[in-house]
Amino acid sequence: MSALCFYFQVHQPYRLRHYTFFDIGVDSFYEDEDANCGIMLKVARKCYLPMNALLLKLIRKYDGRFKVSFSISGTALDQFEAYAPEVIQSFRELVATGCVELLSETYNHSLAFLYSPEEFREQVA
């Protein structure tokens, strides 16, 4: 069997709620908690949990002859912890096989460079 290593980047952004001019000074909650929860539960059920179960099955079937790497953003980890902790457990089970490596990842995927070079430098420094 040829050497094979899969790399998966795991990221879940926070969803923003509709925020109008009239909300300024009245409501400072920018994130849509219902959307964050609903989307996380859906992608956990349809994507993360089935894929991690499949990878675990294949690692066992092929006796660890391939490797998998994950980089998981901080926003994804925060949402897994809040809404779908079983996803974190599924990653732990994969890491325990010795065939899975966790790589460094940024907390979020900022677009600050589009608006402010100074802010971008602050975030990556």
Task: State the predicted function of each range.
Residues V68, I72-A125:
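Metal-dependent polysaccharide deacetylase catalytic core of the NodB/CE4 family, i.e.
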Residues M1-D63, V68, A96:
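N-terminal regions that are enriched for targeting/export leaders
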